[in-house]
Design a protein with these regions (language model features):
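Short, solvent-exposed loop/beta-turn-alpha elements that line the ligand-binding surface or hinge
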Residues: 133-143, 204-211, 225-249, 300-305, ...
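Hinge/lid segment of periplasmic solute-binding proteins
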Residues: 32, 116-167, 185-190, 198, ...
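Glycine-centered hinge/linker elements that transmit conformational signals in sensory
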Residues: 190-191, 235-268
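Extracytoplasmic/periplasmic substrate-recognition and gating elements
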Residues: 178, 256, 260-263, 300-365, ...
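Conserved N-terminal structural module of periplasmic/extracytoplasmic solute-binding proteins
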Residues: 2-10, 21-120, 425, 429, ...
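Extracytoplasmic/periplasmic solute-binding protein
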Residues: 157-164, 168, 188-239, 243, ...
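A structural signal for short loop-to-beta-strand junctions that line the ligand-binding cleft
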Residues: 109-110, 139-175, 321-325, 392-399
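Long, aromatic- and glycine/proline-rich binding clefts that accommodate carbohydrate-like moieties
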Residues: 151, 310-315, 361-411, 415, ...
Length: 443
């Protein structure tokens, strides 16, 4: 429970306030640490949520927002109570594997947060229940293409409600880089020119260290060429033509960013988006590849006259006519229960709390085009850019071998950036190890 601080007040006041909002036992309260709805409600559903998407969120505005939404939902559905299991934010990734196993043995919660990345695995296992009937055709058609692709099974049915997403973009200081680079060559040229204008800045920063962001962010360079990581069976194919050439092009481009001086070699150690924000605040970077989610904190942390210098554009590509792909992630809600009433309630909760309202609370991007028009949070012109970028969104392949593919690509990028391996050597090693992992999984 979040601590309530009431200055110049006695303990009784604090207890009273907590009692009003969270309940003090019995059936009176509609919201507690682990329950939404009255304790004596006749119908019960188990609900598993990430901590960030609850009234226990670390961000105060998020906690307050979800407290309001949970309370309203409980009041609107007096016959239902949700027994909450809250997953700590630093365990959400690991929890997906546990959730998949729980579903396999019939012990999954009735309703839960499911990472968009692993939804295809849940569908393939038969863990998720179809939810088509709770969404109109118009609502389903309004989803961005990458969203529909992920949540739709081979049978054409919709199996999860993907409600929040993000994307990767290029941030640049317009006093140093007046025009947005369209190609890799222009990116390197403009980065070097910026360093000539101001010797204190790095021309271009990006994730190059050992973490998922390095693979995911830079896959845009691979996808924009038409690259595929795996085939329809989930087997790695990024080392086979034409994908091999596309991946070599990506690795050679990243190598050139360092070799040319456009990027410092220390990009091989960057594994946190916060480094880009810190560099922007210090005035030591001209361009960086980051996420849409960095726009609000940059706006808040930079003086207005400095923030005005920054603009956002799409990720440059190898050729000027290549589509400007971008990696997209985010969270869904899935229904696991065999009880149709609980599946229905799961989707009612999702639509009342997360779709639209949850985007308003968190600022995370909607997955439906129309919500960009409807929600006040996204009226600022920059969200038109994000909305347009999502049309070229790409989700990671939701196959069991992807984590090892990502790990191997991280290693490959790192060894190329530091000069330990040539792009060819790094790719061959990454592909060999990814295939071995896939073959081991097939046993």
């Amino acid at each position: 429970m979040r601590r309530w601080v009431v200055r110049s007040a006695g303990l009784a006041v604090v207890v009273a306030l907590v009692g009003i909002v969270y309940g003090c036992g019995g059936g009176g309260g509609v919201l507690t640490i682990d329950r939404i709805g009255k304790e004596d409600a006749p119908n019960t559903m188990t609900l598993q949520l990430n901590n960030s998407y609850t009234h226990q969120a670390a961000t105060p505005s998020w906690a307050d927002g979800f407290e309001r939404l949970f309370t309203q939902f409980a009041e609107d559905h007096p016959d239902w109570k949700m027994e909450l299991k809250i997953i700590p934010d630093d365990q959400t990734t690991q929890e997906q594997a546990r959730l998949l196993e729980a579903a396999r043995v019939g012990r999954a919660p009735d309703c839960a947060n499911v990472d968009s990345f692993v939804v295809p695995q849940f569908i393939e296992q038969g863990a998720l229940k179809p939810v088509d009937q709770y969404f109109t055709e118009e609502e389903k058609q309004d989803l961005f293409p990458f969203v529909s692709d992920v949540v739709t099974g081979d049978d054409g049915k919709m199996y999860a409600a993907w409600w929040a997403t993000d994307l990767r973009v290029l941030y640049r200081r317009t006093d140093l880089v007046p025009e947005a680079p369209r190609t890799w060559d222009e990116l390197i040229e403009y980065a070097n020119a910026a360093e000539q204008k101001d010797s204190k800045v790095d021309g271009y920063l990006y994730n190059g260290g050992r973490w998922e962001g390095t693979t995911f962010d830079n896959l845009a360079h691979f996808w924009s060429q038409g690259g595929e990581l795996v085939d329809e069976e989930g087997q790695p194919v990024f080392g086979e033509e034409p994908n091999r050439t596309y991946m070599l092009n990506e690795l050679n481009f990243l190598k050139e960013t360092v070799d040319s001086g456009a990027s410092p070699q220390r990009v091989a150690t960057i594994k946190n988006y916060d480094e880009f924000e810190a560099a922007a605040q210090a005035g030591t970077v001209a361009m960086f590849q980051g996420g849409d989610f960095q726009y609000p904190p940059l706006k808040e942390s930079l003086p207005p006259e400095e923030f005005k210098k920054w603009e956002i554009s799409f990720i440059p590509t190898m050729n000027p006519d290549d589509p400007q792909k971008t990696g997209t992630g985010g969270w869904t809600m899935g229904a696991f229960s065999d009880d149709p009433e609980k599946v229905k309630m799961c989707m009612e909760f999702t639509k009342d709390v997360f779709i639209g309202e949850g985007n308003q609370v968190t600022g995370q991007l909607p997955t439906s085009e129309s919500l960009f028009d409807e929600l006040p949070k996204f009226k600022e012109p920059i969200y038109d850019t994000f909305r347009e970028g999502l049309k070229e969104g790409e989700a990671r392949p939701g196959v069991p071998v992807y984590p090892e593919i990502s790990n191997q690509i991280q290693i490959a990028i790192g060894t190329v950036l530091t000069g330990e391996s040539t792009p060819e050597e790094a790719l061959d090693e990454a592909y060999k190890n990814s295939l071995s992992a896939y073959e081991e999984q097939q046993k």
